[in-house]
């Protein structure tokens, strides 16, 4: 059990037999009355978000989420196959279980797979990945002065907005949490 005062973004808690991830939290101390914590929680199993208010000092159960390293092997007809780095056991995940991870997954990439009570609840990617641009409009001399962006298709098929100076064949860094271009690699 942990106090709601100790909640932070990304933590997982268990309420009503379901596991939730804390998306946002705000500790409020009104001028009159008791303090409280307002939270936005994401149901890990269904993806639904709820807003819940707790009294300050209230206790919640921290979910025991198991995270293990896996290597992405391949994708085939809506199934993504991963191999446990310790036991070499292979698991197959559905599109629902991998979420937006396929946008950034390359073969042989190491990821963390989170499970709760033996059920896979998500794939945790590194915060940034380096991907090759396979298709984009060519940049022209002098394009770097403007702050405009153009679409670029990456080797995974994901389309991201990049500055005009990025060309086909360039390797760029992409933030996996937001899906946005960060820099050239």
Curated annotation (Swiss-Prot):
Extract the Pfam families matched here: EFP, EFP_N, Elong-fact-P_C
Q: What are the GO cellular component annotations?
A: cytoplasm
Q: Localized where?
A: Cytoplasm
Q: Which UniProt keywords apply?
A: Cytoplasm, Elongation factor, Protein biosynthesis
What pathway is this protein a component of?
Protein biosynthesis; polypeptide chain elongation
- Native source species: Symbiobacterium thermophilum (strain DSM 24528 / JCM 14929 / IAM 14863 / T)
* Name used for this protein in its record: Elongation factor P
Q: Does the keyword DNA repair apply?
A: no
